Amino acid sequence: MAIHLYKTSTPSTRKGAVDRQVKSNPRNNLIYGQHRCGKGRNARGIITAGHRGGGHKRLYRKIDFRRNEKDIYGKIVTIEYDPNRNAYICLIHYGGGEKRYILHPRGALIGDTIVSGTEVPIKMGNALPLTDMPLGTAIHNIEITLGKGGQLARAAGAVAKLIAKEGKSATLKLPSGEVRLIPKNCSATVGQVGNVGVNQKSLGRAGSKCWLGKRPVVRGVVMNPVDHPHGGGEGRAPIGRKKPATPWGYPALGRRSRKRNKYSDNLILRRRSK
């Protein structure tokens, strides 16, 4: 990612950075408007996702997570910014005339060709089933259910590793450190998702974060009782409980929050590292 550092002319630009090489110029037939209502609240106005609100209007880009244009070569035409995710996207022109957006693989350049299918080369950006990949391949945009499209390792810089194949399942090490089983006939894309250094980019000021729809993060004790169990009281008050709690009232320190007897428990060989 080519980072442009602002010249220090004001306090807000002292540590600000932006990527000047990637711009947004979406195609009209691959975008549509979305109604963002609530901004982190449900129908009753209760906060269900904290620290959300405001932000600039967005148009949703239709991303091809299925990669079902089989055995048809496509050419990367543009690399664009997507306001709905922290990874970049690239526009693909396929040989049959189809045009689609996909996640930008790290290192892919304008003019490169990609393809998806069963017997395609192990090349960055190509999509193929796990059965046709050698062990140790770095992959992203991984299917969990055949034909449903990629659901794992889609964030900026995300990459998983194929470490074993046995029977009808393949063993993957996910970006979180979790090791789990995936059906071997599911597809994935070779390589790592681009925009790796996005978590190291400094926005420089609070207003830039507001444009992204992110509100300030504050402690629970300074909230109202309707928003957090620690809230309320006269002036500076203790939490009023024996132990800290989450905004939904569950124990905050150490208790596992994963649902018991979940269907995927048998597929997880090692829990994710915290």
Curated annotation (Swiss-Prot):
Q: Name one GO cellular component term.
A: mitochondrial large ribosomal subunit
InterPro entries, per the entry:
NA-bd_OB-fold, Rib_uL2_dom2, Ribosomal_uL2, Ribosomal_uL2_bac/org-type, Ribosomal_uL2_C, Ribosomal_uL2_CS, Ribosomal_uL2_dom3, Ribosomal_uL2_RNA-bd_dom
Annotated stretches, region: Disordered: 224-274
Q: Which Gene3D superfamilies match?
A: 2.30.30.30, Nucleic acid-binding proteins, Ribosomal protein L2, domain 3
Q: Which Pfam families match?
A: Ribosomal_L2 (PF00181), Ribosomal_L2_C (PF03947)
- Gene Ontology process terms (BP): mitochondrial translation
Which terms are listed as keywords in the entry? Chloroplast, Plastid, Ribonucleoprotein, Ribosomal protein
Q: Does the keyword Ligase apply?
A: no
Q: Which SUPFAM superfamilies match?
A: Nucleic acid-binding proteins (SSF50249), Translation proteins SH3-like domain (SSF50104)
Q: Where in the cell is it found?
A: Plastid, Chloroplast
Q: Is Ribosomal protein given among the entry's keywords?
A: yes
For this chain, one GO molecular function annotation is: structural constituent of ribosome
Similarity annotation: Belongs to the universal ribosomal protein uL2 family.
Subunit description: Part of the 50S ribosomal subunit.
- What name does UniProt use for this protein? Large ribosomal subunit protein uL2cz/uL2cy
The organism is Morus indica
This protein's encoding gene: rpl2-A
